[in-house]
Amino acid sequence: EVVLKYYARPEELAEAAAIIFGSPTYYHDITLPIKQVMEEAAKANVMLKGKIGAAFGSYGWSGEATKQVLEVLKNRFGMTLVEPPIAVLYEPNKEQLEQCRKLGKTVAEKIAGK
């Protein structure tokens, strides 16, 4: 079952088999709401080790937020990553939307153990 959330409490992250974070790059960084969830999860010692993590996002000029998200998921939480992250300049085109679908499919296959 796929559940789309615009906000998740840190303890809800532990219930998921996989987490895909979406964050635009804002002033060369992850957006504050995504950062807050990660920081709250870290403070609460939410166990995400071995869970599957991925990231996507948009940017206007720099685009590093998706890589930063993956760094936190790997280094702080010990998650298994699906790489590379998807970073899109402004709005996705048809090919980039297809990349997003493939990312979702890859995550689902990893959950299923394929």
Where are the language model's segments positioned?
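FMN-binding flavodoxin-like domain, especially the glycine-rich phosphate-binding loop
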Residues: 1, 5, 14-114
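Acidic, amphipathic alpha-helical patches
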Residues: 9-10
